Swiss-Prot record:
<dbReference type="GO" id="GO:0009056">
    <property type="term" value="P:catabolic process"/>
</dbReference>
<dbReference type="GO" id="GO:0008774">
    <property type="term" value="F:acetaldehyde dehydrogenase (acetylating) activity"/>
</dbReference>
<feature type="binding site">
    <location>
        <begin position="14"/>
        <end position="17"/>
    </location>
    <ligand>
        <name>NAD(+)</name>
    </ligand>
</feature>
<comment type="similarity">
    <text>Belongs to the acetaldehyde dehydrogenase family.</text>
</comment>
<dbReference type="GO" id="GO:0051287">
    <property type="term" value="F:NAD binding"/>
</dbReference>
<dbReference type="Pfam" id="PF09290">
    <property type="entry name" value="AcetDehyd-dimer"/>
</dbReference>
<dbReference type="InterPro" id="IPR015426">
    <property type="entry name" value="Acetylaldehyde_DH_C"/>
</dbReference>
<dbReference type="InterPro" id="IPR000534">
    <property type="entry name" value="Semialdehyde_DH_NAD-bd"/>
</dbReference>
<dbReference type="InterPro" id="IPR036291">
    <property type="entry name" value="NAD(P)-bd_dom_sf"/>
</dbReference>
<feature type="binding site">
    <location>
        <position position="288"/>
    </location>
    <ligand>
        <name>NAD(+)</name>
    </ligand>
</feature>
<dbReference type="InterPro" id="IPR003361">
    <property type="entry name" value="Acetaldehyde_dehydrogenase"/>
</dbReference>
<protein>
    <recommendedName>
        <fullName>Probable inactive acetaldehyde dehydrogenase 1</fullName>
    </recommendedName>
</protein>
<keyword id="KW-0520">NAD</keyword>
């Protein structure tokens, strides 16, 4: 059944991420509608496409949004600009802002893991594409055993890494690493990001290593990961395990040597995840962008429904 709730949203940034997000919302029968797409370059690209589709646009950047007649109806703003836009006017208006860039303003949010804890938070950071793909796996392992260390390696196609992605790569790695701890629950973490120039372009691939204290029940970890993958797949259909979860046990007589921390005894869990982007705007190899736009749309839909129910209960 089509939801009766309709929440107009504004998208800041008319590049690949902003345009794909717009197309996803336009083709959805969910609670979101596109009230505005804001960028800096009227054509070619997202703004020209939005105008053809009847979406209100502005080429004046963030400063142009409050001046638009549609601004008063906007309930949620997606910030898909490379470094994050100033938001004093947005805060005054009381809109919810979802950041699709590594500039951390609000708490980290990964919908499959912790969105329900932040439905009333005015500003959420959606981490990175790598974080959206890997943090759920670390969190799933952490629900069975204590993750003392998590390391993730994400490889993306060079064609899916635009200039903004390349310019912000250090900040993206820092944000992903932080989210592995704050959302994933790992005590220590490291994130590695690789831009692969192969042609034809590769699909997004993520390898997640978790060092878990003690000899944990492997079946429970596999079940927890499978359940988490199912949750992520509900909003990113192209997200899947590449192969079965791998386990390796290290004992006191044969520990795993880790630089700076010494020997580790316990279980190493290795998970391989692959992401294929889908319709309508992104090519299949742009899984890193797919993770961001799909997570953003899922988060906004849940927040919109929550706000509607909260407002209804208050009247």
């Amino acid at each position: 059944m089509t939801p009766t709730v309709k929440c107009p949203v504004a998208i800041l940034g008319s590049g690949d991420v902003g345009t794909d997000l717009m197309m996803k919302i336009l083709r959805s029968d969910g609670p979101l509608t596109v009230g505005a797409l804001v960028g800096l370059d009227p054509e070619p690209g997202g703004l020209a496409r939005a105008e053809r589709l009847g979406v209100p646009t502005s080429a004046a950047g963030i400063d142009g949004l409050p001046a638009m007649p549609e601004f008063g109806d906007i309930g949620i703003v997606f910030d898909a600009t490379p470094a994050g836009a100033p938001r004093a006017e947005l805060e005054k208006a009381g809109v919810c802002v979802l950041d699709l860039n590594p500039a951390v303003v609000g708490p980290h949010c990964v919908p499959a893991v912790n969105l329900e804890d932040h439905l009333d938070t005015p500003n959420l950071n959606l981490v990175t594409g790598a974080g959206q793909a890997t943090v759920p796996i670390v969190a799933a392992v952490g629900r069975v055993g204590a993750v003392s260390y998590a390391e993730t390696v994400t490889s993306v196609a060079a064609k899916s890494a635009d200039p903004a992605t390349r310019a912000n790569i250090d900040e993206s790695i820092e944000t992903t690493t932080a989210a592995l701890r704050t959302v994933g629950g790992a005590r220590r973490a490291r994130s590695i990001f690789i831009i692969n120039p192969a042609d034809p372009p590769i699909l997004m691939r993520n390898t997640v290593y978790c060092l878990v204290d003690g000899d944990v029940p492997r079946g429970d970890i596999e079940q927890s990961i499978a359940a988490m993958v199912e949750r992520v797949t509900s909003y990113v259909p192209g997200y899947r395990l590449k192969q079965r979860v791998q386990f390796e046990t290290f004992t006191a007589t044969d520990p795993l040597h880790i630089p700076e921390t010494g020997g580790f005894t316990g279980t190493r869990v290795t998970v391989l995840v692959e992401v294929t982007a889908g319709e309508p705007h992104l090519p299949g190899y742009a899984g890193n962008l797919e993770m961001m736009t799909s997570a953003a749309k899922a988060a906004a839909e849940r927040i919109a429904l929550h706000r509607s129910r909260t407002a209804g209960a208050a009247t």
